[in-house]
Design a protein with these regions (language model features):
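Alpha-helical scaffold domains
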Residues: 1-148
Length: 148
């Protein structure tokens, strides 16, 4: 894909018509081939699937740069729901740092799991700790970051 200098249209075609392996290859190539947010629909599609390999591939550096706060928070929760290790989420430390809305969402999820007698994923505690530190990226309020 990189050698072919595939544009967003070509990447979309390969992703849409490709196998799971080809879709993952497209997602991994995005940060190297698409400088702006034009390929976000591919990331969003992968995050809607139940294929944990696609979800993990979708959360690379491209998503870290281009997903808005709302989408990114829900992607982190999807990882917890589906068992995708949060080590696969690019730029997790920076994006989670100081994110009080993510902290609230994580606490709610942990409470639901506990009330249902289910274990709370270990990754949740690590990310919750990250939300307690202030990151420069989250030092100012994001008008679109508030969940409803």
């Amino acid at each position: 894909l990189h050698a072919a200098r595939a544009d967003t249209e070509a990447l979309t075609r390969v992703y849409s018509q490709g196998t799971a392996d080809e879709r993952r290859a497209v997602l991994y190539a995005l940060p190297h081939l698409v400088p702006g947010p034009d390929a976000l629909p591919l990331v969003e599609d992968a995050l809607r699937t139940n294929d944990t390999r696609l979800v993990a591939a979708a959360l690379g550096p491209y998503a870290a740069r281009h997903l808005d706060a709302h989408q990114w928070r829900h992607a982190v929760l999807k990882c917890l729901f589906t068992g995708v290790p949060l080590d696969r989420v690019a730029d997790l430390d920076r994006r989670a740092g100081g994110d009080q809305e993510l902290a609230r969402m994580l606490a709610d999820y942990a409470a639901e799991r506990t009330a249902a007698g289910r274990p709370v994923p270990e990754d949740l505690h690590r990310v919750l700790a990250l939300t307690e530190s202030l990151s420069p990226a989250n030092a100012t309020d994001d008008p679109h970051g508030k969940e409803s």
